[in-house]
Amino acid sequence: MVSNQDYTERIRDLMKDHNSWMESSINLIASENITSSRVKEALISDLSHRYAEGLPGERLYEGCRYIDEIEEITIELSKKLFRAEHANVQPTSGVVANLACFFATADVGDPMMAMEVPYGGHISHAKVSAAGVRGFKIYTHPFDFENMNIDADAMKKKILEVKPRIILFGGSLFLFPHPVEEAVEAAEEVGARIMYDGAHVLGLIAGGYFQDPLREGADMLVGSTHKTFPGPQGGIILCREELADDIDEAVFPGLVSNHHLHHVAGLGIATAEMLEFGSEYAAQTIRNAKKLAENLNELGFNVLCEHLDFTESHQVVMDVSDIGRAAEISKKLEANNIILNKNLLPWDDVNRSDDPSGIRIGTQEITRRGMKESEMSEVAEYIKKVVIDGRNVKEEVSEFMSSYTKVHYAFEESGAYKYMEIL
């Protein structure tokens, strides 16, 4: 008979197995990353047990003497990194951050313009998720299929036509900067707020690359803190000072009771790391993405946007419909310790999420493990061996990845997937 303690040991063993698998894998999931040992230390601290409702200095609980200072430091570091007038670090996810901005700046029934999901928009921008929860009427940005981006001229005309309360940029399939500056004049004419969901590219923006939404005219920059930004899972809102009170009230008491204090501490540490190393990390992530795209293209894969040098972000996107089903290809690669995901492409029906045409790749985690352009040809070759040649390369991949076990772009190089055993 299995005892309750046996289950605790089983779960512990599974966590260790997971860490070992990740260490021996090429992880190309575009929405994930690895944190430094200092961030991990924060995540297992006593802060994970505590409550601190409200803002620093205005808590509803006692016992927040040190918690207040941690959050204040994290807020100030975030404002410095993003050159923002105001920062709220309490959202427990990127979707919660989005929803807080929706509640703070618009009402039920208001129109919002956003990317359609197959075009690259995140599900929280759609009626079935956070935007629908707020009761928005959703209008989609006109899309340029060839250039995989919003059609700026058509967008400006549509803004004047539908008069949205929020113009939302950003998405989860995100190769090139969005036309924020081009929207400003039309937004001012119709009284719209410009919101930028930087969840995927937040680390690139922090490093001074991709684009600078707050300088280009966005009122709000929001995102999750664990994709290209190598922090703990959570969300952040950066905005103009005039929106600060409404944003803070939308977060608490509006959407979040107690936020995750250990994640706030981890975010503060990760933000300090990005202030120190973010520029180098972001630049290398983009260089790796461009090189990997070039290598895959040379090997015969249909990598999108060759005419635009493939990408300006951490992402590489392939249409694999001419060689197989993306769902099957991603499973074959997973069996060979190459982890990525199938993805809808703009020409796919939104209901085909289980059987789309595309593969999405991200280079941020392998960059954090120390890879540079020279390794991208090997990564591309392993993908080809599995997908085109039908070979098993699991052992080769594991051996290859044994040289990349440390976290880079941090104050000390530590084991990327070391299991932090306490007992």
Swiss-Prot record:
Residues carrying N6-(pyridoxal phosphate)lysine: K227
GO biological process: glycine biosynthetic process from serine; tetrahydrofolate interconversion
Gene3D superfamilies: Aspartate Aminotransferase, domain 1 (3.90.1150.10), Type I PLP-dependent aspartate aminotransferase-like (Major domain) (3.40.640.10)
Cofactor(s), names only, from the UniProt record: pyridoxal 5'-phosphate
Role according to the record: Catalyzes the reversible interconversion of serine and glycine with tetrahydromethanopterin (H4MPT) serving as the one-carbon carrier. Also exhibits a pteridine-independent aldolase activity toward beta-hydroxyamino acids, producing glycine and aldehydes, via a retro-aldol mechanism.
Subunit structure: Homodimer.
Name of this protein: Serine hydroxymethyltransferase
Organism: Methanothermobacter marburgensis (strain ATCC BAA-927 / DSM 2133 / JCM 14651 / NBRC 100331 / OCM 82 / Marburg) (Methanobacterium thermoautotrophicum)
